[in-house]
Each structure stands twice: as C-alpha cells, then as structure tokens.
Amino acid sequence: ITGQHVAGLPCVLGHEGAGEVVAVGPQVTAVKPGDRVALNWVPSCKTCFFCERDQHHLCPVITRRIFTGYMADGTSRISRSGQPILHYSGISTWADHMVVPEECCQILDPEVPYEVAAVVGCAVATGVGAALHCGDISPGDSVAVVGAGGVGLSAIMGAALAEAGQIIAVDREPSKKHLSIDLGATHFVEADTDAIGKVIELTGGRGPDVVI
C-alpha cells in the first residue's frame, strides 16, 4: 500500500455490487431495463492493444479514466446542490442507484442471488483469475494459498477448477479451516505456527508448485 492511488473527494464509494437495470442511455446495447447484472469495476474497451491480447485489466481506454473519479466520457453523473461528486472505480456501489458504463454490466443467471453476485465483481474475479490466468496451474500441481479471506477463498476455488492435486490454505484464523476445506482446500495450515515448514512438509520437502 503506497498511497499512490488516491480517491478524489467528495465521492460515492463502493466497488462490488449487483442489481437490476432500471434505465439505459440511447446508445446502450448490451443490457436493457429489467436485466439482472453483476458489476465489474475493471471494464475494458475490448478493442485496444491490450484487450486484443486478452489483457483486459490493462485497458487504458476506460480503466484509467474511471480511476480519476469520472465516467468513461470524462463526466460525473452524481451531484449535490449543483456540485459534482466523483464516482469510485466507475460504479460507486454504496448507493441505491448507480450510473455505470455498460461495459461494467455482466448479465446474471436468474437463479444467482444478488448478495452472491456482488462479490463476483472483485473478490471472486481476483482470486479465481489469479489461479486460472496468473498461477499457470497444471492438473496435479500443489498450490499454497496464503490468506483465506474473500480473495483467497476464491483462489482456492480457482485452483480446484484448475484440477490442482493439493491445495493448502494458510491463514492466521483457525475458524477459516472448515470453509477453506468446503471450497476445495485439501489442507489447512495456521499462519502463526511454522507455516513455511508445514507447507514444505506437506509437499514432500519440495515446496508447492504455485503460491498465491
């Protein structure tokens, strides 16, 4: 944490959310009123240099603009007493209603509840994405996931999807064990013990193939 990314003030915070589309702008084609959507706080234009190489998180066209507190067109859609209020991560989910770029909207399966869908936009995308796209996990690999919070638990699920043979969850809080195991971990190690030694022991003295 360096403090290099500082949100401007005043702003409406919140970067995870889901809800129902109630209205759309005249040029919107991806969603319509009544659609149930999860919100993605790192949208992409899908046509730039990085997007064409499947590196959507590096897209400069939309992402860099929204980090300044404005919409993709450089304007704010929130105001109070005639004064603009900045957006946060392009979606500002701590509000009853939000104005977001259509690129942020991911249409939901009707059976997915909003409280589950809300965390998909950051915690799940980050953790599962780390396992599937950054970890380069091969079937049968041993994987250690350090931290079993929302992102870590999602990484555990991602490692399971990648068919890792051994998934070791490491966390300071013993109460995280059962949920970690339920979501795919094969072992749980308390971080306040000799965690490194135990992980090495569990992997036959070799250490894990992948650490997240």
Predicted regions, residues:
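Mid-domain Rossmann-like dinucleotide-binding core that forms the NAD(H)/NADP(H) cofactor-binding site
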Residues: 96-97, 103-105, 109-193, 197, ...
